[in-house]
Amino acid sequence: MTYNQSSYIRVRFGVYHFVRRVPADVKQHYRSDRVSISLRTKSAKAAIRSAQSISQRLDDYWHGLRLQKMD
């Protein structure tokens, strides 16, 4: 899947955060309906790089959860 990675980036008090909704089919594994992580940077370029990495890891993790559910 291809997403606009910048749509997962928010700025709070000058620091970038990654915020992404948890898909409905894996929500039972989470306490919240969103994943929110401070990227600990004030650089937009660094934030985009980090957000892409986190987003890919989440996609892979969620894919694994979906595969386990099929068993």
Map each language-model feature to its residues:
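Short, Arg/Lys-rich segments that mark the N-terminal edge of DNA/RNA- and chromatin-recognition modules
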Residues: 1-40, 45, 60, 66-71
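A short, charged, amphipathic alpha-helix used as a generic interaction element across diverse proteins
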Residues: 43-56
